[in-house]
Amino acid sequence: LPFTRLNGGPMDYTPGIFVQDLASVTDGKNTSWVNATIANQLALYVTLYSPLQMAADLPEHYEQFMDAFQFIKDVDIDWIQSKYLLAEPGEYVVIARQGKKDGQWFCGGVTDDHKRTVEVPLQFLDPEKTYEATIYRDAEDAHYKENPQAYVIEKKTVTFHDFLPVTM
């Protein structure tokens, strides 16, 4: 979608699922599974442009992961500009977007079902400034089926000259 439909404009998409086993919320009637990690669900808020955004999971699920839910509260929903930083259609995409609300940058990356690490160039940042990045990422043992709720939140000082290693 980032390479086709979203090139023409926004679309309706509702990310934010934190509890991936739907049987747990349907008394076993729906055995479907959301094939994503929490970090992947957060990245979709940036990579899939939808200016009418919502949180798609149950409130009690967000209460279990309030630190991750903070991203949903903070992320902008409309953008001044968007930059595709790294991409291979059908495999992965990393997009940076500058929010209309306060000019803050958000960067999101998603991959297919193959875990990968990429070096994200930060040349979209102002070369005269230093930034504190809050990074929401998959934990080392995260897996969309076996451990979808394993994530790490870390802070790092970055500049225009840096490359940020991101594992998806």
Q: What is each model feature region?
A:
Residues 1-59, 85-87:
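Glycan-recognition surfaces
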Residues 54, 59-61, 111, 137:
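A mature extracytoplasmic/lumenal domain signature
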Residues 113-168:
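C-terminal beta-sandwich/jelly-roll accessory domains of carbohydrate-active enzymes
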Residues 69-97:
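Edge strands and adjacent loops of beta-rich recognition modules
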Residues 89-131:
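Carbohydrate-binding surface patches
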Residues 51-55, 76-79, 100:
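Alpha-helix capping/termination and helix-coil
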Residues 12, 43-48, 95, 106-109, ...:
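Structured core elements
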Residues 60-70:
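A glycine-rich phosphate-binding loop feature that marks nucleotide/adenosyl-phosphate handling sites
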